[in-house]
Amino acid sequence: MADLKTNLLGFVMNSPVIGASGTVGYGVEYEELADFAKIGGISGKGLTLHGQYGNKGERLWETPSGLINSIGLQNPGVQHFIDVELPELLELKQKYGTVAIANLGGHSEEEYVEGASMLSDSAVDIVELNISCPNVKVGGMAYGVKAEAAGEVVRMVRAACKKPLMVKLSPQAENIPEMCKAVEAAGADAISLTNTFQACAIDLEKRRPVFNNIFAGLSGPAVRPIALRMVWQAVGAVNIPVVGLGGIATGRDALEFIMAGAAAVQVGAANFANPRAMETIADEMAAWMDKNGVKTLDEIRGCARNAE
């Protein structure tokens, strides 16, 4: 019988399958739909220091093999999360062992640091730092584009945060290996990648861009091979765990990331198509392992790299 248990930053998870931020709410919304005993962790909806209403206009747009979103980090703010949503997330942990991950964004170094400090004093298990947010001090360029800027914000957050720190990287980074090395040197305990890919859609009838901000984030099966390439690069660049995400929709998809060296995986857009996607992926992983005589994920983690 396959054993999917996965150790991530000292937390032993039921499986390597984590719900990606922005696709599973704060976990409790899925409790009646999914078997949480098969889910390793939940990365809650992205937070900012202060609550945000998010973007106006269209927010979701389907593509032939993916989903474009322009939510705009709508969230209640860090303190509200600590007071209201986190206790519900921790109830899931108590019932099922699901690791509680807080995803934190920000629009300045000061916002990141204050938010991380508050989360550091909370009962959350892991802080996932979203550095795809625009830096208002440099004309809106995302922190996750240049390694130097990313390293600086991670260094500042590391000093303020006692919790295990996982940094979520953008595929728009100028150089993925250098970005990974920069955030590792700055104190990241783990890396997750990739975030969504910048995309655009045009409404032919309205003769204008679908989204008010013109560009938005593409996720889903279309991006998976590119995300897998970036995870491969990341694993080869650093000595900290890499959590892979981007278009994972089946157990075979997840196993590709594991064989590339990922410590765990996150599932995002697939949850919109199938609210039981996470447990289905875990089941499919276990079935493949049983069929192929693999007892634990450690037996195959990074095995594809032997061909290098």
Predicted regions mapped to residue ranges:
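Extended, intrinsically disordered, low-complexity segments
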Residues: 224, 283-308
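N-terminal capping/small domains of soluble enzymes
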Residues: 1-100, 106
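Surface-exposed amphipathic alpha-helices with a cationic face
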Residues: 7, 11, 82-95, 120, ...
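Alpha/beta enzyme core
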Residues: 107-243, 252-256, 260-267
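Short gly/pro/ser/thr-enriched loop/turn and capping motifs at secondary-structure boundaries
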Residues: 48-53, 134-136, 198-201, 272-274
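Small/polar glycine-rich anion-binding or flexible loop at a beta-alpha turn
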Residues: 248-252, 274, 306
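Hydrophobic faces of well-ordered beta-strands that scaffold small-molecule active sites
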Residues: 4, 17-20, 40-44, 100-104, ...
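C-terminal helical cap(s) of enzyme catalytic domains, especially alpha/beta-barrels
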Residues: 54-64, 202-216, 258, 270-295
